[in-house]
A protein has these predicted regions:
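Active-site segment of extracytoplasmic enzymes that catalyze sulfate/phosphate-ester chemistry
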Residues: 12-13, 19-98, 102-111, 122, ...
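Short, polar loop motifs at secondary-structure junctions
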Residues: 116-119
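Active-site-proximal cap/lid insertion segments
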Residues: 4-8, 15-31, 136-159, 163, ...
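A general structural signal for short secondary-structure junctions and capping/turn motifs
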Residues: 39, 121-123, 171-176
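Short, structured coil segments at secondary-structure junctions
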Residues: 126-127
């Protein structure tokens, strides 16, 4: 994707709950990911890569600090349910020297565009030169999200993937050619949890998955260990809806179609960012990385 240079630009796209089996280039003929498939043909495709923790916040902390959860101390998702107990502008990784801070010292301009989920989103700009993020980490909907955009606060009605893609392209377009940049584009999709994927898809890929039998998702029963784990969470009273809904998603066809449609939305965003780099003649001098915080419990294991 890029030619060797002293300080290449870096674009790190981080999807949310996107499993390795959720791409055409990994053998899934039901999902629609033409841009990721094209990228894989000229890139290194890691087939044995493992996330440090199958929870959102620990993975994000690890990618920004280079530390394992046992080192940075974040072992589960950071839940806004307890936000009233947080210090003002609390940043869960504030004590560590993070990737964007290291790159800034090397002369990079740095930007977080997308989901933060490492404490109070108000604190995200402290470690990035530019920040456009969501005011909460948990994804309740892909639409009507409250946005933190520098000093501005507003609600954006459209799909969050399109919104953050637009912001990423704006950032690339305004970056100086004299200074390398690090763009951490963190999509809050495909996500895979209710209520965000509950029901049939309504985005522009809805027709593609209409009536799909979703044969790429196993139809086996849920293991006893998973049921026991869910029961423990329910007994602890986490959340309002009960974690037993997680057991329903792998066998709920409308939700699965919705989930795959959100994967296609992410793929579309990847394609648009690649095109923006090519249009600005930056593709050959940009290290382009696509990854996910972790996968999604759809029954493959």
């Amino acid at each position: 994707m890029y030619m060797a240079s002293n300080k290449p630009n870096i674009v790190l796209i981080y999807a949310d709950n996107h499993p390795a089996v959720g791409m055409g280039c990994t053998g899934n003929d039901e999902v629609y990911t033409p841009h990721l498939d094209r990228l894989s043909q000229s890139a290194t495709l890691f087939t044995e890569a493992y996330c440090p923790n199958a929870m959102c916040s620990p993975c994000r902390a690890s990618v920004l600090t280079g530390l394992m959860p046992s080192q940075h101390g974040i072992h589960t998702w950071i839940d806004e349910y307890f936000k009233e107990d947080w210090p003002d502008n609390w940043n869960a990784i504030e004590e560590f020297d993070t990737l964007p801070e290291k790159l800034a010292r090397e002369g990079y301009d740095t930007a977080l565009i997308g989901k933060f989920h490492l404490g109070d989103a108000q604190s995200a700009p402290d470690i990035f030169n530019k920040c456009v993020t969501m005011q909460i980490g948990h994804v309740q909907s892909f639409y009507e999200n409250d946005i933190i955009d520098g000093d501005e606060r507003y609600k954006h009605p459209g799909h969050s993937v399109d919104f953050f893609t637009d912001k990423a392209i704006d950032y690339i377009d305004q970056c100086s050619e004299e200074k390398p940049f690090f763009l951490f584009l963190t999509y809050p999709a495909p996500y895979g949890h209710w209520p965000s994927i509950q029901g049939e898809p309504e985005n522009r890929y809805a027709d593609r998955f209409s009536g799909s039998p979703m044969l790429s998702v196993p139809r086996e029963g849920i293991s006893k260990q998973a049921i026991d784990w869910i029961s423990v969470l329910n007994e602890k009273g986490y959340g309002d809806d009960g974690y037993d809904v997680l057991l329903q998603i792998p066998n709920d066809l409308p939700s699965l179609r919705n989930y795959y449609s959100q994967i296609s939305m992410v793929d579309d965003g990847v394609g648009r960012v690649l095109e923006a780099l090519e249009n600005k003649s930056l593709a050959d001098d940009t290290l382009f990385i696509f990854a996910s915080d972790h996968g999604m419990s759809l029954g493959q294991h």
